[in-house]
A protein has these predicted regions:
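Acidic, metal-ligating active-site segments
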Residues: 1-16
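RNase H-like nuclease module associated with reverse transcription
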Residues: 6, 18, 24-144
Length: 144
């Protein structure tokens, strides 16, 4: 049965290999793709912050922001502009965490077109060529 809840996914890589990934159904029904991407971005931001703290404990220099690749420009605009009220008035406050970590320059957002979204290997059925390309991008190689 389709409950109309969106599915979000992320993959974090280090040195060309996946070190953290998630595929999760969102807890609420999003009324727009923008809201769904924004909610997914908040979950991704929480994991990014945890990974930054972990890598810092291991001695990694974390002075530069961690880049999140986002394929929804409206979700990016909501993150950067707290006055974007019409689209945000029904978004739960807990999802606005992403604004804080972007504003304090711990994370940065970069627009990446859907065709280049590596995490889509978790959330979508892809054409074989795209599947192989994205699996290679996260360090998974086909065995001969």
């Amino acid at each position: 049965m389709n409950d109309h809840k969106s599915t979000s996914g992320y993959i974090f890589t280090l040195g060309g290999s996946a070190i953290s990934w998630s595929l999760k159904k969102q807890p609420t029904v999003a009324l727009s793709s923008t809201k769904a991407k924004y909610i997914g971005g908040a979950h991704t931001a929480k994991e990014a912050i945890w990974l930054r703290l972990f890598l810092s404990e291991l001695g990694q220099d974390m002075s530069l922001p961690t880049t999140l690749h986002v394929n929804n420009q409206s979700a990016m605009a909501i993150t950067w502009n707290p006055e974007f009220h019409e689209c945000t008035k029904r978004i739960d406050v807990c999802y606005h965490y992403i604004r804080q970590v972007v504003n304090d320059e711990t994370l940065s957002l970069v627009y990446t077109p859907t065709q280049e979204q590596v995490a889509d290997v978790l959330t979508k059925g892809l054409a074989p060529a795209s599947h192989i390309k994205f699996m290679g991008a996260i360090g998974i190689q086909q065995l001969a």
